[in-house]
């Protein structure tokens, strides 16, 4: 079980920091699990630190719920990695400052969704069709498979196809190209009413739109649908229950063509060689899964992670842990392999991968809107657990490290962490954060070192001439005064004292994920911050935030996960720089288009993916 310590874990388990126990929330409740107002200890140092808050005081924000109180709806806030939800794994959340957003207030994928409005209350058949006794299924939540099956049933079962059109058993001829003016039976009119209702429900589905066009094309009759392909873009108001059974399938985006991979006919694409064309396949939206597609494309363009999957190096790391679960890593690798062996115009269906991620993290079951950062956390945690090289984790040692200098203490803490958590995923994404808490009366300073997967950065308030990423980093690492109700208890003074809290980066990861906190929380509502943050594409120098002297803290941007919309609904896309060609592309679900590097910086940037620069670029 991953032992990356979250703030909530440290607050709940540390006898030094907490006198009163914190109740563990049930599934579906929101609990902040990143750095809040107080400093916390790592799991090995929880008995060593000399500060503890007064028991009646809690500095963690209270949960807040929006919308219906169903499990999936009320569980869209910050994830709590509990063993009863995702098995026996548990890891730290990203390190963040300030209040976290409440339940239901994430940057949610999809568009047109409003919290508090159940999509299951919608009906997609017109009233006249229902009044006439249409025999179609009256389910209020239609999957793509159901729509396709019902659509196929609209054919007159006792009719037959002829060279001049379509005839019923009674002898009436129906011209498919002139249905509106052909004589027809009352049953046929009912079916056309039902057809109209289905068309309204599936008007945004590329697959059913193609079928409708073929149905109305003169001189052709509809083909019998035996198996519906994965949906391309399910209407955002639908709550589909589609459960695909096939592997990753390539479906042609162009209308009127047979399914299967094909090359784009856009100018310039056909002249690209196979090497430069790799990695440009789109991902089909299975229904509000744009948050997942955005993160998958960012990870697909992570050079070392891509090579780990393409070269099948993950196979040697599978099955080392006591848990035999390896399906998530295998499906993720297969998906990356499919993306990188497809033509630019191909669309890959990530249905099998979604099946595995929702088995690992049930919060992603169904087709509700989700937060991209939360999805990234769960995904990396699951991949890490399945390829962890540590077969048997040693028990935590009671050895004290307080007598060591901070630099040596940090190294020892990192060594102890690797004794329990050692994977290729962690090699790429995990860094180490140093937290210090200093008493202003006696000067006693306590330090802890915690692993992190990403950093959540507050966004500077409006009024600045320009908000830069460096401003956000400085705001994250600046000294905070803990006073008043926030005073912790100093064990040396044996009283609550005014203290200074400060963060710094002890160890920089190879892949640095920066989360821009685009939510402003108030007691009334949570709003999205659309502040434009200017971030560099190359040579992001973070050496001033290092806890010790280092020259290895310069990064280059290679991917951005964007969110457009509001807290009530929106859409996720990704901007990625190819590790092969170095060119930027926009990944918008099934659509992949080239873009200029000058277009990468927008006010929709939500997650920034930086890779550690090679020595020549740091000159």
UniProtKB/Swiss-Prot annotation:
Active site residues according to the UniProt entry: 290 (nucleophile), 571 (proton acceptor)
Protein name: Ubiquitin carboxyl-terminal hydrolase 2
Residue positions binding Zn(2+): 439, 442, 490, 493
Gene that this sequence comes from: Usp2
GO cellular component entries: cell cortex; centrosome; cytoplasm; membrane; nucleus; perinuclear region of cytoplasm
GO biological process: circadian behavior; circadian regulation of gene expression; entrainment of circadian clock by photoperiod; locomotor rhythm; muscle organ development; negative regulation of calcium ion transport; negative regulation of transcription by RNA polymerase II; positive regulation of mitotic cell cycle
Organism: Mus musculus (Mouse)
Tissues expressing this chain: Isoform 1: Expressed in heart, liver, kidney, pancreas and to a lower extent in skeletal muscle, brain and testis (at protein level). Expressed in testis, brain, heart and skeletal muscle. Not detected in the small intestine. Isoform 2: Expressed in the small intestine.
Annotated GO MF terms: cyclin binding; cysteine-type deubiquitinase activity; identical protein binding; metal ion binding; ubiquitin protein ligase binding
Activity modulation comment: Cleavage is inhibited by ubiquitin in a dosage-dependent manner. Cleavage is blocked by ubiquitin aldehyde.
Domains (record comment): The different N-terminus extensions of isoform 1 and isoform 2 determine their respective subcellular localization and differential effect on myoblast fusion and accumulation of muscle-specific proteins. The different N-terminus extensions of isoform 1 and isoform 4 are not essential for their catalytic activity.
Biased composition (Polar residues): 1-17, 134-146
Spans annotated as Disordered: 1-23, 54-112, 133-175, 221-275
SUPFAM superfamilies: Cysteine proteinases
InterPro entries: Papain-like_cys_pep_sf, Peptidase_C19_UCH, Ub_carboxyl-term_hydrolase, USP_CS, USP_dom
Keyword Transport: no
Subcellular localization(s) per the UniProt record: Cytoplasm; Cytoplasm, Perinuclear region
Native organism taxonomy: Eukaryota, Metazoa, Chordata, Craniata, Vertebrata
Biased composition annotated in UniProt, kind: Basic and acidic residues: 90-100
PROSITE patterns, per the entry: USP_1, USP_2, USP_3
């Amino acid at each position: 079980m991953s032992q990356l310590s979250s703030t909530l874990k440290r607050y709940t388990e540390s006898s030094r920091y907490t006198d009163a126990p914190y109740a563990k929330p049930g599934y579906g409740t929101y609990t902040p699990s990143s750095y809040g107002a107080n400093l916390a200890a790592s799991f090995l140092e929880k008995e060593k630190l000399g500060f503890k808050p007064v028991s009646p005081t809690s500095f963690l924000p209270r949960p807040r719920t929006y919308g219906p109180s169903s499990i999936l709806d009320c569980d869209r806030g910050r994830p709590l990695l509990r063993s009863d939800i995702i098995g026996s794994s548990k890891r730290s959340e990203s390190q963040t400052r300030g209040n976290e957003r409440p339940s239901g207030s994430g940057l949610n994928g999809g568009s047109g969704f409003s919290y508090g409005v159940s999509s299951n209350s919608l009906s997609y058949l017109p009233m006249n069709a229902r009044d006439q006794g249409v025999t179609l299924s009256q389910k209020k939540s239609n999957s793509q498979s159901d729509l396709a099956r019902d659509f196929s049933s609209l054919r007159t079962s006792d009719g037959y196809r002829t060279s001049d059109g379509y005839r019923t058993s009674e002898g009436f001829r129906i011209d498919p190209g002139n249905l509106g003016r052909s004589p027809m039976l009352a049953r046929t009119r009912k079916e056309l009413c039902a057809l109209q209702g289905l068309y309204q429900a599936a008007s945004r589905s590329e697959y059913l739109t193609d079928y409708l066009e073929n149905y109305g094309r003169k001189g052709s009759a509809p083909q019998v649908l035996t198996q519906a392909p994965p949906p391309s873009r399910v209407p955002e108001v639908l709550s589909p229950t589609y459960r695909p059974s096939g592997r990753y399938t390539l479906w042609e985006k162009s209308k009127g063509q047979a399914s299967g991979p094909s090359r784009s006919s856009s100018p310039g694409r056909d002249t690209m060689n196979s090497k430069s064309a790799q990695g440009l396949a789109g991902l089909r939206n299975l229904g509000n899964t744009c948050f997942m597609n955005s993160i998958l494309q960012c990870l697909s363009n992570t050079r070392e992670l891509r090579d780990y999957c393409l070269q099948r190096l993950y196979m040697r790391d599978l099955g080392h842990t006591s848990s035999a679960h390896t399906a998530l890593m295998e499906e993720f690798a297969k998906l990356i392999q499919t993306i990188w062996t497809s033509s630019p115009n191909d669309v890959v269906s990530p249905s099998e991968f979604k099946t595995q991620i929702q088995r690992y993290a049930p919060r992603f079951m169904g087709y509700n809107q989700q937060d991209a950062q939360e999805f990234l956390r769960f995904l990396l945690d699951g991949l890490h657990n399945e390829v962890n090289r540590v077969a048997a984790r040693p028990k935590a040692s009671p050895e004290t490290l307080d007598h060591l200098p901070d630099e040596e203490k940090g190294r020892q803490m990192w060594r102890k962490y690797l004794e329990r958590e050692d994977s290729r995923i962690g090699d790429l994404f995990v860094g180490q954060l140093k937290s210090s808490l200093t008493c202003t009366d006696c000067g006693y300073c306590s330090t802890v070192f915690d692993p992190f997967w990403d950093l959540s950065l507050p966004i500077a308030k409006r009024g600045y001439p320009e908000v830069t990423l460096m401003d956000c980093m400085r705001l994250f690492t600046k000294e905070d005064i803990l006073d008043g109700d926030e005073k912790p208890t100093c064990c040396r003074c044996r009283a609550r004292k005014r203290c200074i809290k400060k963060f710094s980066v002890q160890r920089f990861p190879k892949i640095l994920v920066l989360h821009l906190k685009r939510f402003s929380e108030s007691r009334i509502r949570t709003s999205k911050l659309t502040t434009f943050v200017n971030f560099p594409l190359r040579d992001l120098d973070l050496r001033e935030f290092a806890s010790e002297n280092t020259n290895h803290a310069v990064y280059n941007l290679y991917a951005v996960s964007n969110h457009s919309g509001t807290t009530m609904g929106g859409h996720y896309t990704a901007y990625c720089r190819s590790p092969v060609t170095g060119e930027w592309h926009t990944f918008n679900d099934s659509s992949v288009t080239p873009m200029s590097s000058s277009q990468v910086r927008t006010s929709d940037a939500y997650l920034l993916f930086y890779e550690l620069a090679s020595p020549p670029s740091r000159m």
